[in-house]
Amino acid sequence: MLLGSVPQLDRVAVQLGPFPVYWYGIIIGTGVLLGLWLATREGERLGIPKDTFVDLVLIAVPIAILFARMYYVIFEWEYYAQNPSQIINIRQGGLAIHGGLIGAVVTGILFAKRRGVSFWKLADIAAPSILLGQAIGRWGNFMNQEAHGDEVTRQFLEGLHLPDFIINQMYIDGVYYHPTFLYESLWNFAGVILLLALRKVNLRRGELFFTYLIWYSIGRFFVEGLRTDSLMLGPLRIAQVMSIGLVVISIIFIIVRRKMGQADKRYSEN
């Protein structure tokens, strides 16, 4: 697709009759499948039946999407109150990661209790998978030309040595923008490598998941400061408030669980 003289990628991957299939959905789905593969592989190594994570994903993903959308709509209620028909329209994006994370954690706790397995063990195994899905999912934002930063020049983007297809896709309505999706995606990919390395350290159970929360939140806090489409609560950027909260809560949980003897088991223990 061409916008003026700048070639751009079409957000529609394929047209099936009257139904468009968007890259956003394909990319999100790819992230989920790769994350599932990573989790089931590690789960089997640690004695978790392969179908455990398959069952969890089948339940958690729809609920996470529902929570992600609800979270987004709540903080954009002024718009959706006037356009209620758009509440269920997620083809153009509008899914908040923090909302999805809340939904996934709630589902994971209930699922683990029903299956009689440790939630912390499942959460530790799933942590790299969740971050991998987030890293891949940001490219869905790229295709939708959303979740970008403030205005920049083409020369600035070229100075980052980015390929032309990224630079061109950051050209929106006659203006170039910060590719904040890319910054967060790269930070998350680095986090996946870190978490995979920390598996070998054999941390106490639950602490790999808290490390994920801390790592992701630090990156999200700084990237969010560059974005122009942040969900707001008065003068506050909601994602930054949530990021600070998650870092603090994670550190507190690590300390308290150790002092109370609730983190005696190690990552690889049954």
From Swiss-Prot:
GO cellular component terms, A-Z = plasma membrane
Q: Write down the Pfam families for this protein, in alphabetical order.
A: LGT
**What's a GO biological-process term for it?**
lipoprotein biosynthetic process
Q: Which domain of life is it from?
A: Bacteria
The record ties this protein, via InterPro entries, to: Lgt
The residues that the entry says bind a 1,2-diacyl-sn-glycero-3-phospho-(1'-sn-glycerol) are R138
Give the family from UniProt. Answer: Belongs to the Lgt family.
Protein name, per record: Phosphatidylglycerol--prolipoprotein diacylglyceryl transferase
User: What organism is listed for this UniProt entry?
Assistant: Bacillus anthracis
